């Protein structure tokens, strides 16, 4: 999002979310459920787990290094699918009867040696766990973090509302309030901005899989009144707000029967809804030595603390890494003209208050715990309903004092 966004008197921005029963999200959740199982067995496990699904089938592939022991992957897959809500063959997909194929093997030793001992300290002899420099980045790449003061969770409003709608759909389905809903669904919200501030919701789109015998009129009424109006603040809705509910007119065939799914295909849904840049790396199925995940979490942590400290109203950070190297290659910041102190000062304060080496990120955010399955639906950021330590603003006060604010 450029600085022109802050200068425009009228601008529209749209973000989407998907429900936990979307085929791509099934795969993300399976990959993270498998990851959590390995981390429960061995907190230092190295995991790269990918999942694909189509009609009647889930395939789990990847590379894993861990202390030997039995991990019941097929059982984990079926339980995850059942928890999502695919419990009846009439939905087009059933946890008990779908096929499950597993093809997982060991991590490449060439990659492992770079992660195990970072380039700066690699050599003969044992390196202790306490030396954070011993963990090098698991791959090259750049990661972004973002925060803004549009919402209490310091997230962009369009993606925040889209996620709230998705969670509400899931809750009403699972509680039996709207029993005709099925697990697959999508939401999309368009917000009107004026000079960088949200002023109203222009359009809300909801598509949700449903039973064949329910009418479109009932679906539209229930979704507008029990879902949209329940989560969108009334002051943001006016007589010009537009609603689209299942605009194709019918959404009976859904889930993996309607579309194939794959881990890592909803990276914008997972992050900031397109409001911020993205380095391209997906999160789910990756242990925290993979900086695609851990560094993106750290960048969100930094950005949220900068905004919570009042150093800027909108803030984006980029961090870049080389495989096997612990220290970031570069760190850059962008405040979109909203900063209260210079960007140079903010960058200096970040370097003083945050250690962005992979080992330090894992240590400070306690990332070797099995906390990832809940992140795999409804966004990794802006969450107060799950264990997400990168959402803490524990360094905001120190940043504020150091900046003289």
Swiss-Prot record:
Residues 107-117 are annotated as: Flexible loop. K(+) binds at residue 50. Mg(2+) binds at residue 24. Its EC number is 2.5.1.6. The keyword tRNA-binding does not apply. It is an enzyme of class 2 (transferase). Keywords: ATP-binding, Cytoplasm, Magnesium, Metal-binding, Nucleotide-binding, One-carbon metabolism, Potassium, Transferase. ATP binds at residues 22, 184-186, 250-251, 259, 265-266, 282, 286. One of its GO terms (molecular function) is magnesium ion binding. One of its GO terms (cellular component) is cytoplasm. Pathway: Amino-acid biosynthesis; S-adenosyl-L-methionine biosynthesis; S-adenosyl-L-methionine from L-methionine: step 1/1. L-methionine binds at residues 63, 107, 259, 290. It is found in: Cytoplasm. One of its GO terms (biological process) is one-carbon metabolic process. The keyword ATP-binding applies. Its cofactor is Mg(2+); K(+). Catalyzes the formation of S-adenosylmethionine (AdoMet) from methionine and ATP. The overall synthetic reaction is composed of two sequential steps, AdoMet formation and the subsequent tripolyphosphate hydrolysis which occurs prior to release of AdoMet from the enzyme. Homotetramer; dimer of dimers. Belongs to the AdoMet synthase family. NCBIfam families: metK (TIGR01034). This is S-adenosylmethionine synthase. It comes from Roseiflexus sp. (strain RS-1). The gene is metK.
């Amino acid at each position: 999002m450029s600085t022109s966004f802050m200068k425009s008197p009228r601008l529209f921005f749209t973000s989407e979310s998907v429900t936990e029963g979307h085929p791509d999200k099934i795969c993300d959740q399976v990959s993270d459920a498998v990851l959590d199982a390995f981390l429960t067995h061995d907190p230092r496990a190295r995991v790269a787990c990918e999942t694909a699904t189509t009609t009647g089938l889930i395939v789990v592939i990847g590379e894993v290094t861990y202390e030997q022991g039995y991990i019941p992957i097929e059982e984990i897959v079926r339980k995850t699918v059942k928890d999502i809500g695919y419990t009846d063959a009439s939905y087009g997909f059933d946890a008990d009867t779908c096929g499950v194929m597993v093809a997982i093997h060991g991590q490449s030793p060439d990659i492992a040696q770079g992660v195990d001992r970072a380039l700066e300290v690699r050599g003969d002899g044992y390196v202790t766990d306490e030396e954070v420099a011993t963990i090098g980045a698991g791959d090259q790449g750049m990661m972004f973090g973002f925060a803004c003061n549009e919402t209490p969770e310091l997230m962009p409003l369009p993606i925040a509302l889209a996620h709230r709608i998705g969670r509400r759909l899931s809750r009403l389905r699972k509680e039996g309030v709207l029993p005709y809903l099925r697990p697959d669904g999508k939401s999309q919200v368009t917000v009107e901005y004026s000079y960088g501030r949200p002023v109203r919701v222009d359009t809300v789109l909801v598509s949700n899989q449903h039973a064949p015998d329910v009418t479109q009129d009932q679906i539209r009424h229930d979704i507008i009144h029990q879902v949209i109006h329940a989560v969108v603040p009334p002051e943001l809705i006016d007589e010009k707000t537009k609603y689209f509910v299942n605009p194709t007119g019918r959404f009976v065939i859904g889930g993996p029967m309607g579309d194939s799914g794959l881990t890592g295909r909803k990276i914008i849904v997972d992050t900031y809804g397109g409001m911020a840049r993205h380095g391209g790396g997906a999160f789910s199925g990756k242990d925290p030595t993979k900086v695609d995940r851990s560094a993106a979490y750290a960048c969100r942590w930094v950005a949220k603390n900068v905004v919570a400290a009042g150093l800027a109203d909108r803030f984006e950070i980029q961090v870049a890494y080389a495989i096997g190297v612990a220290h970031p290659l570069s760190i850059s910041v962008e405040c979109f003209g909203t900063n209260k102190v210079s960007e140079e000062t903010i960058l200096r304060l970040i370097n003083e208050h945050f250690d962005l080496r992979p080992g330090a990120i894992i240590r400070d955010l306690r990332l070797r715990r099995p906390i990832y399955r809940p992140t795999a639906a409804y966004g990794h950021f802006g969450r107060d309903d799950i264990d997400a330590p990168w959402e803490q603003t524990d360094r905001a006060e120190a940043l504020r004092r150091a900046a003289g604010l």
